[in-house]
Amino acid sequence: MTKKVETKTYEIKAPQFETIKVKIVGDTPLIVHAWDAKAKREILEKEVFGKSVKKREAKDPIRDFAASMYWLTPMPEELDAESIGKEFENGARFGFPTTAIKQAAINAAYRLGWAKDKASLRPAFQIIADTHGYYGADLAINHNTQSIDIIPNTFKPYDMCEIISDPPVMREDMVKVMNGAADIRYRGEFQNWAMILTVQYNKNGQYSAKDILNIIQAGGYACGIGEWRTERDGVNGQFHIEAN
């Protein structure tokens, strides 16, 4: 006698994407550290031309401070205190990578046991960028002279959310670099900050809007964003969702 085979039918609902506006408010200062063109040049000179690392240049705290931030408006031509101050007075705007905010949320949800793995959380929501780039120094490789030139004030593609804040301040930190040596870093710090996130999710997906908000909230508390964040044994970059 032939055994009857049972069949099951599964309904796959079409994705229904919706967006929500979420305001996150900083609970602790946000420290930013964009990749410095000078540091990148040292790496590339060794890898492209086989040059040994040059004697370290004298530190310029003001320049390092300005270069550490993601400028949404053009940087001043001269990275000195007076020029930077004028840009602040003229309403200079700054951003932060959307990917870092999303990663904080995913890491927190995974560590809290809300998902079996991080991969399943990545398509659950997207953070839509306010702008798709920022101003900073970039590099140009010259094979004829075997040199790498720094090109200032270049618009570099990267998804960014705008930081709503008082003008940033310069902070000085003692850090340990990869070889264990001590170094001093000068970076931008935003003390009273917020961001308005545009979050897109699938209404017919596994996670509801409330779930997504809880995941983002957990990211702000358990992981944080930026340098010396809670995820990295620090106290900075924590945030919460402002209730409507």
Kindly give the residue locations of the regions a language model identified:
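RNA-interacting cores
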Residues: 1-244
